[in-house]
Every structure is written in structure tokens, then in C-alpha cells.
């Protein structure tokens, strides 16, 4: 009967049994999906190495540029795992597109999570910026033993660059949307850092854990429900800030629109969404130089 048909949204989350913690588990790993990121991935890796990331699990969606070569030149086997992960999948019963990122994140937790105290699930245009400490793990001391941390996007657009400027991405783009908790559609969202050995439900932007269900904490350790984290009261960037370099230059934005998104089959819908997000960001911006200050203070070599 039609009313029993699963909703398309069911393809966007997965229930799992948490992995068992392995002896000596420690540190933070990042799991990320990539495709043809050769232009900027060196900077992303160098920065996150500098802030204490122990291992990178890279799910490669069919890159044809030098992404893999660059990664292997920067990281040894103790710090890098590349998993080929090309293609799209649909639910056979409903024809709903399965979210490839959700599947990779669940795979990362189940196969590798037992080795780590924390796993972060971000994209390669997103940077985890400690605000007071030198490393991400030190910044997470503020949440204590709580297993589910949500970091709001701080959305950066073109910063007036028509073409790609010389030098590091993180030093060239400083203009971001003023309100990370805006209610404008698709401009506000979260990425998560979790204790993988407690996760029971996986999605791109939210997780559930065994002891706390859908409760999640901000970077200061203040706990909210999944729905309530969208309230202004949830906002904090005192200890850890997630910078999302959404467009880069205007030229790169146009290239992004021409490529489409690997996990969205509707090119027109994707283009309209991206342009709407950019417009919303650029309507109200602030100059945020906290990344530059951190890089200079800690003498981080970004390789560009």
C-alpha cells in the first residue's frame, strides 16, 4: 500500500551498532569524501595536520586529477587511508537516491572508529579552527566526555575575488556571513565531531549516540536536542570554529555550478540552491580574520 512506502528522507540516515573501542584508542581522525580536489587539498591536509589530526580517511569519488598523488606525497600509511568510492546508488524499492556521504561516514565509523577517541566528518572546503588552544583535541576539552558535538557553519563567499588569487585559501578569504545561525534556507547547518564508539545513527549533518540519543553539544559543552540546536542560544565559537569556504573565487563558483554535485542528480535545482546561498551570505557579511591570526600565531606552513 502507498502509505507504507518509505519516504525519500529515509535514504539520508543510517542506523548502526557502535564499534567496540580498541585498546589504546586515541586522537582524532577525519573522514571526508573528495573528487578532483588537487588545487586545495594540500593546504587542507597541512592545516589539519598542524591542529593535531591523527589520520585522514579519504573516500575518493573517482578523481582524475592529482588528488591521490598529492595526498600520498604529504601523508604516510600511518596517517592516510584512501578508499575508492565512486558512483551513485538508489534504493531498489523506492528509487530514492541514497546519500553517498552518509554511507561513507557509516563505513568509516564501523571499520575504523574503534581506534579513535573522536572522528570528524567534514568536507575539504571546511576547516576546523581552534580558537584558544593549539589543537582540535585540546579545544574539545570543553565538552568533556560528551560524545556528540555540532559545529555551525561559518560561511565564506568570494571575498571580492573574481579569479583565484595567489597564496593560501585560508589567508585570502576573510568575508563571511554575519550570522552563522541565520534562518535563511541552506545557509545555516552543522558538521559534527563524535565519539565513534557511541554512534547509533549516522547522517551528514547530525548523529545520534547510545546514551544521549539526539542530544548534541556546542563547542562549549552546552547540550541541546537536534532540533533545538538551531536556536540562537546554541551558538558558540569560543573554542572551535568551523570555517566553510563555500565558493572561493567567482570563477571557481561558476566552475562548481558547471560540474554539479556528485550526490545530486538535479543540476538545475543544485545551481539555484547554490546561487541562493551565495546571495544570502553576501547580503550581510563580517570580516573574520581569526584563521589568519591562528595560522600566524602558530607558524603553520600551508605549502603555497
Q: Could you tell me what each predicted segment is?
A:
Residues 1-46:
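N-proximal low-complexity "stem/linker" segments adjacent to membrane-targeting elements
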Residues 54, 117, 147:
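Short acidic/polar active-site loop segments enriched in Thr and Asp
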Residues 46-55:
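Short, acidic, metal-binding catalytic loop of nucleotide-sugar glycosyltransferases
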Residues 1-12, 98, 130-304:
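Catalytic-site signature of metal-activated, phosphate-bearing donor transferases
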Residues 116-129:
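Short beta-strand-to-loop acidic/aromatic patch adjacent to the donor-nucleotide binding site
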Residues 32, 59-67:
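Ser/Thr-glycine-rich phosphate-binding loops at phosphate-binding pockets of nucleotides
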Residues 68-118:
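Active-site-proximal specificity loops/subdomain of glycosyltransferases
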Residues 54-62, 83-86:
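Short beta-strand/loop segment that forms part of the nucleotide-sugar
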